[in-house]
A protein has these predicted regions:
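Structured catalytic core of nucleotide-sugar glycosyltransferases
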Residues: 1-84
Length: 84
């Protein structure tokens, strides 16, 4: 299993396209994968953009209520990945 960790903050305009591109890459790949997106207290529509993707992709969204920064968000994603 390959875990792809994606920290994000206010990425409503780009995160959907990124997830779809990753899906395209793995369509022909024989490897199992799981996407982990860390929403670092986005104030835009990032959570709304991510929600429908959880139904069609192997995707987990970890939302933070307070801005933690890139490094802490990535660390949280990595820690979560090792528990799966």
């Amino acid at each position: 299993m390959l875990y792809i960790c994606i920290p994000s903050r206010n990425e409503a305009q780009t995160v959907g396209l990124l997830l779809w591109k990753i899906r395209q890459v793995f369509t022909d790949a024989p490897r199992e994968y799981h996407l982990l997106v860390g929403d670092d207290a986005s104030t835009d529509a990032t959570p709304d953009v991510l929600a429908p993707y959880t139904k069609v992709l192997p995707l987990t969204v970890l939302r933070q209520d307070r801005h933690a920064g890139y490094a802490r968000t990535l660390e949280r994603l990595l820690r979560h990945a090792v528990t799966l």
